[in-house]
Amino acid sequence: MITADLKGKKALVTGAASGIGLGTARLFASLGATVALNDLPGDPRLDEAVDKLRAEGRDVLAAPGNVGEAESARVMVRSAAEAIGGLDYLVNNAGTPGTRRPIPPADLDAQSEAFWQRLLSVNLIGPFRCVHAAAPYLKAARGAVVNTASISGFGGGGSSSVYCATKAGLINLTKEWARALGPEVRVNAIAPGLVESAWECRFPEDDIRAGLARAPLKRVGTPDDYAEAILYLCAGASYVTGHTLVVDGGLSA
């Protein structure tokens, strides 16, 4: 396990009620950071996560808000930054597959205009909204942004063609934001493969087994695996920006 001294650092993690987001918030808080955990308003898992981390002695707070809605995202980011006294790190982890089952690329009828708009608003425009609102705080702190993309953003194969397109766009925006916000702010991304979490979209077990058979490390990645990569890009990697780090156990090797 990699480690760092994050005492005095301030972080906002979106999509932090479960999975990679919660793993990241837990790791950062355990290393001394003050962490604002964001997820959808009314999601009971958000309050449960905050309560559990506080019981462990961590300095955390809930920052409910919908990154898929412009005003909600803006208010959430600014309120969180003011509440914790600034922002050193923004982790854009919130995202949605928008479907409970994978949609084959040929099933164009299932990929409606409304489906496109929802995924674009959450997965692609959502991170932009958060970066836009957080930029003044991050520049003042000479901070860092990490976006959660996906290996499907490189070669497809995700929950839908639409999802893959949004993650490909986020990989591209990671480069654009690195140029736009440097030298004060570094912007990177991770591209996860298989994740051990209760994700909204469930892939067939045969597909998961086939993926594991191809992957050199032969296991599904845990939220902690991805959190360590995010920690590296936030607290280390001082000469790395505009990069998307593939974290998939070798699945795409």
Describe every region a protein language model picked out.
Residues 150:
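Residue(s) in the substrate-gating loop at a strand-loop-helix junction
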Residues 101-117, 200, 211:
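Substrate-binding pocket helix/loop in short-chain dehydrogenase/reductase
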Residues 96, 109-128, 146, 163, ...:
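Catalytic Tyr-X3-Lys loop
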Residues 4-36:
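Canonical Rossmann dinucleotide-binding motif of NAD(H)/NADP(H)-dependent dehydrogenases/reductases
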Residues 131, 166, 174:
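Active-site helix of classical SDR
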Residues 182-186, 240-242:
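Short, small/polar-rich loop/turn modules that mediate ligand/substrate recognition or access, typified
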Residues 136, 178-183:
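Alpha-helical segment proximal to the catalytic Tyr-Lys
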Residues 84, 131, 137-139, 219-247, ...:
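C-terminal substrate-recognition "lid" of short-chain dehydrogenase/reductases
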